[in-house]
Amino acid sequence: MMRIVLFLLTNLAVMLVFGIILSLTGIQGSSVQGLMIMAGLFGFGGAFVSLLMSKWMALRSVGGQVIEQPANEVEHWLVETVRSQAEQVNIAMPQVAIYAAPDINAFATGARRNASLVAVSSGLLDNMSRAEAEAVIAHEISHIANGDMVTMTLLQGIVNTFVIFISRLLAQAVSSFLSGNSDEEESNSSGNPIVYMVASMVLEIVFGILASIITMWFSRYREFHADAGSAKLVGREKMIAALQRLKTSYEPQEEGGMMAFCINGKSKTFSELFMSHPPLDKRIEALRSGQYLNK
């Protein structure tokens, strides 16, 4: 989940910075076609900047340390497990990192399949059996082998393009209306530049949040495939055991609305649309039924 959250936050930040610069400098599409081209350039630009920065951002955010030379038996096992699985799926050896955190967690990121990173938390190494940890690592290796980050980037670029395009069209209409421009003036002016800038920023945030429903759906879909990839690499039972360990480790104490933010995803409310991972029960059931194993 961390790689998705970091990717989306970085992407949103880049989009907002681009939007502010364009508004302050007065650089805007002179026509609908021009606006679409500009939206595409900055929409995909934000997504690819996020992708290129993903490893650096991820390591910096968690304080992760890349293992250059294994210092102990645990690090040696981790590096060799990643190496073995990478060879099985025909990708270059990813960088391997550990970060200090009590949570059972791991993530994979990187701009290319052959220039990737796999990071695991100390909580995962301390609280999971080797078989369970092996399955989690295989899940992350499957994300890399499947090219999920690049595919997510392309999807995010398309979503960004439409968010920027629609937001700026509506912002221009709002600004022109509040400025009292005539129809002729409206076609050549965005009205009050301050109103236009504020309206476009607010609309980009709102539409960006709504558009995240699409990217989160795709993320949940790819999680099922990564689970299946792990099952193929290390065995279905190991992956099921790892998910069951996650389920017992993250049994929620919160009530009501807060339950939606728990990793096990038991809540079946509207907020599930914004979850990057499917509920653990659904993932376990998909593995048991073999729903994604032959896809």
UniProtKB/Swiss-Prot annotation:
It is an enzyme of class 3 (hydrolase). Its cofactor is Zn(2+). The chain crosses the membrane at residues 4-24, 34-54, 147-167, 194-214. Binds 1 zinc ion per subunit. InterPro entries: HtpX_protease, Pept_M48_protease_HtpX, Peptidase_M48. It holds the Pfam family Peptidase_M48. It comes from the Bacteria. It is found in: Cell inner membrane. Keywords: Cell inner membrane, Cell membrane, Hydrolase, Membrane, Metal-binding, Metalloprotease, Protease, Stress response, Transmembrane, Transmembrane helix, Zinc. GO terms for biological process: proteolysis. Its EC number is 3.4.24.-. It is a multi-pass membrane protein. One of its GO terms (molecular function) is metalloendopeptidase activity. Belongs to the peptidase M48B family. NCBIfam families: PRK05457.1. This is Protease HtpX. It comes from Photorhabdus laumondii subsp. laumondii (strain DSM 15139 / CIP 105565 / TT01). The gene is htpX.
